[in-house]
Amino acid sequence: MNDVMLQPMGERTPMTQSLRDRAQDAIMCCAALAWRIGGNVLFGMTTALALQQVPLPEACDLDAEMLHITSSTPDRRRRRIPGTHPHVWKLIATHPDACVPIKGNVFALHPFHAWAQLSSHVSLEELVILAEAIITAISKSSGRYPRLVLSSLREFIDNA
């Protein structure tokens, strides 16, 4: 397997531990790629979720083991690197909070942006389930009440 691809999550590991382990694995893979590229790298889609300990959608037409690199415009898109898939997300330019620093040169799209990115790759049911997972993850990591996180998600949707 390519050294920059994520490993599949173990099926018998408790979810919180497996999310933590998957995030650490993702950070290592993403940091190695950023070092190889020699600069900051923004990750989106399922990679952004993995980096931030958000459960991945069960039914998604993207390969969750690939590293999904995101840029703001097509001309800024990274060249194709084995084990990666480049994407463009134009909202980066207009939403200053779209990029979340993870470690060193590794950045991830905010979970709301990753959710919106994934909207064309999952069913409506999966999108609702993913929104709930994101609300829970943000609530747990920030200490904010889930209703406040939901309100922030609604505001994001209204302003996107």
Report each predicted region and the residues it spans:
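Short gly/ser-rich loop at a beta-strand->alpha-helix junction or flexible surface loop bordering the NTP-binding
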Residues: M1-A160
